[in-house]
Amino acid sequence: MPRKGPVKKREILPDPVYNDKVVAKLINKVMYDGKKSIAQKIVYGAFDIIREKTGKDPLEVLEAALNNVMPVLEVRPRRVGGATYQVPIEVAPDRRLSLGIRWLVEYARERKDKRTMKEKLAAEIMDAANNTGGAVKKKEDTHRMAEANRAFAHYRW
């Protein structure tokens, strides 16, 4: 906890092609070892595949995918008198977006069906837009956990 007041959030620059901050965050999440140009090729390649297969604007498909993946509730552990309870809490908007992007990239990497990361990412985004895929399942599991632990909601802080 800083002594000089709250920490300011860094302003992220929009990506060069679509001029969109969400796409820039997606590129940063795909990036390994600071190799941004490779991450950009992967994301833009995935967008080309999405445009080819769906005939829609890739940004619209990404928006739909993120809306289906972003969690509304999650559980946080809270110690009360020697017992640890999983307390359901609402997810802040910034965290919702970052979790949604993280899960999309994570489950795209885990896919076994496609050969290249472009294809995997495109497939995961299209699946998420259609309410299927690993990332959507992760969101549903998170919501199920929150629902199961609803009895401990009064321990919120």
UniProtKB/Swiss-Prot annotation:
GO MF annotations, alphabetized: rRNA binding; structural constituent of ribosome; tRNA binding
Top-rank lineage group of the source organism: Bacteria
Pfam family name, one: Ribosomal_S7
Cellular component GO terms held in the UniProt record: small ribosomal subunit
Gene3D superfamilies: Ribosomal protein S7 domain
Membrane-crossing residue ranges in chain numbering: none
GO biological process entries: translation
Alphabetical UniProt keywords: Ribonucleoprotein, Ribosomal protein, RNA-binding, rRNA-binding, tRNA-binding
Quaternary structure annotation from Swiss-Prot or TrEMBL: Part of the 30S ribosomal subunit. Contacts proteins S9 and S11.
Entries under NCBIfam families matching the protein: rpsG_bact (TIGR01029)
Function: One of the primary rRNA binding proteins, it binds directly to 16S rRNA where it nucleates assembly of the head domain of the 30S subunit. Is located at the subunit interface close to the decoding center, probably blocks exit of the E-site tRNA.
Protein family: Belongs to the universal ribosomal protein uS7 family.
Protein name (Swiss-Prot/TrEMBL): Small ribosomal subunit protein uS7
